Amino acid sequence: GPKCPFNSDTVSIIIETRENRNRDLYTLQTLQNHPEFKKKTITRPVVFITHGFTSSASEKNFINLAKALVDKDNYMVISIDWQTAACTNEYPGLKYAYYPTAASNTRLVGQYIATITQKLVKDYKISMANIRLIGHSLGAHVSGFAGKRVQELKLGKYSEIIGLDPARPSFDSNHCSERLCETDAEYVQIIHTSNYLGTEKILGTVDFYMNNGKNNPGCGRFFSEVCSHTRAVIYMAECIKHECCLIGIPRSKSSQPISRCTKQECVCVGLNAKKYPSRGSFYVPVESTAPFCNNKGKII
């Protein structure tokens, strides 16, 4: 059969709330069986999490990210598992050859998220201002395509898209309409951690370059690219757990110590980034071991 096929049968939806953390699998058709979807309206804010190439929603870093969100604030976390279309289940030696197929599936998965969003807004009265998307690697571009589609559907913009080391291959030379772009949400936050698998391009309202966006500390010399690429997910979970864990310094002032940061010019990575006035590119020094925080207890 075709490799890495996308259709609504090859995607699963995992929903987590404080009351219901059991990570059961749902589809668009069975969503209404979930306790949260039996309500007339859903009042809590929603975060979608989308994984990347050859990964899945049950990979431990994504489980930890979802848990951090549910623990931190009363979010409903919707994890999109598109592992089949991301080539996760193809023969190990061959799956990398199918990357272009997975890359082209990102638009379809994004449209699928937009369909779920339409249901949330129309049937459950959720405001778009209460929905944000977090996507890693190819999942960052999935989130961008979802952001384009909801605007086509006249739903407005998502409040935020967080792109965790958006994938470089197949996307780097693309026009805005063919990749994650800063117009895809009210606020687009990009975390750069690698420069081969991930892009170095400025894509967002704010772009954070962790350790200059490559060779992240603690990743070693070998396989450091894959390790650095994955670090983006780990850093985001820590930034949700610890307020102002990672502070970004404007790249124009990257020699300045974090201790001199003010909330006018520096920005805390994470869910509160958009509350800071500063925009553009930021340098983020990172410690080599968890929780990786650079703020030495300082909160701006």
From Swiss-Prot:
It catalyses: a 1,2-diacyl-sn-glycero-3-phosphocholine + H2O = a 2-acyl-sn-glycero-3-phosphocholine + a fatty acid + H(+). It is found in: Secreted. GO terms for biological process: lipid catabolic process. Keywords: Allergen, Disulfide bond, Hydrolase, Lipid degradation, Lipid metabolism, Secreted. It is an enzyme of class 3 (hydrolase). Pfam families: Lipase. SUPFAM superfamilies: alpha/beta-Hydrolases. The keyword Methyltransferase does not apply. The keyword Methyltransferase does not apply. This is Phospholipase A1.
